[in-house]
């Protein structure tokens, strides 16, 4: 059946509303879940910062990740929350933020529908439009999208795909109707996509390649290359402009891959296996296959994907059908960087080398594959019945698994525990440290001691468990226990300044000030030794962990707590001389000056501290008011 243009528009509005209604029908309850986040830097540096400090907080956060669009959407959430509550409609910010995530995801599902229509050049055919819509529902309910939808701080993936799909659609329009305005939109949308997530760089190659494949059998090779060259150059230039701007804000981060070829090969195959299983068989809990480092299974799955790629290539050359080959290249392009991440040994800047959310955009390929299946197996009744039955089975299974995974995001405690408890790197933290905290809350010291001893047996060298034992024995006033674990910590961390600094701060927290001083003195001695060794070989010290200004700052706190205010002031000033942007050192120096009765000088230091770090504004303003009374 052929639709008119107006009927086609009505159809598109209807399917968007149907998709939105379907998703809310199954997942409306998640709007009432608490805030979950896996990004402490975001929470501390942006979400909690006062209004006039948002800009500087996003700048500080950009030292790690450059996500300006992401921050703007969170500010939009805050603004909408304010408008609703100002109008008398009481609503939590978490509900607004979660609704924004759902809105973005459903919109991406609709863009997948439009994208498939564009690559197939299907305009107003009702039957094909329905099949494309059914295929887009696979994207909508695919289980690996769970974290993107239900976790507020992983919105950048959906934003990146949103702008990426719009870029793709405009490029397809431009391929058949070249206009200057299209080039402007392409550059802007691709720039916004990169600002949301750098991993969408793959579109710079995938978009021209897709257009090339679509035209391969229609025009000659030279003309085909010319048709794509302008878009390819535009996307590359946009990327280089973005990357230059990003390099201005972010700090340099060195990553190191595994040295051994065997290790590289092993992690290439196992990382590929992780993402291929997540894409094609997402019906197990993620960590069932995340912790499975079976190389044989990984090679088998990779081989199956190669066979599928060969089949798609056969259809392209012999049947002139580019659809499956486009899906192959989409999977390869979108998963290249995530697989490379899996081969990083040290210095990876994100939370985990392997994460399902990194492959959010690759789910588009699954919708393309399902459209091909529904389209090519609907010519005969029995094939149509088989295809639709298979589709319904997969769709309902996806909804069921996605519903089950949504329960992880009830609150942040559940989220952090459930998502990491089976991770081989984090099992010691979550199997016993979480029950320990619960036992303390419930005043159940038997359960606390049981989990503490189990925690220690898992990893006797882990600093967290040694400090936990110290905390316990200090509470129990058990001198023998304290001595044993102090010696144990000394044995494990005597040559590691960052470990010694942890112990010093632990002592400060427990008001063991002289012990804390002694530990910091040990670090200074080690630094003097390191400095002499490097200077003897003509090298220069550029970075220390912990930084020297932090050592003086900690000494200042200790002297302040001991009421040795003159010495504390000297330490805080030294920290500020070493690091002029150490606003907290200035702030504490101001408090010390107030203790010494120098109110005028204290007021000036408060103002200097606020100028460097507006986060201190509210507290400092109160103290200034008190000082001037």
Label each PLM-derived region with a short phrase.
Residues 2-3, 417-629:
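C-terminal luminal/periplasmic domains and tails of membrane-associated envelope-modifying transferases
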Residues 2-445, 453-464, 470-472:
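Polytopic membrane enzymes that build or remodel cell-surface glycoconjugates and lipids
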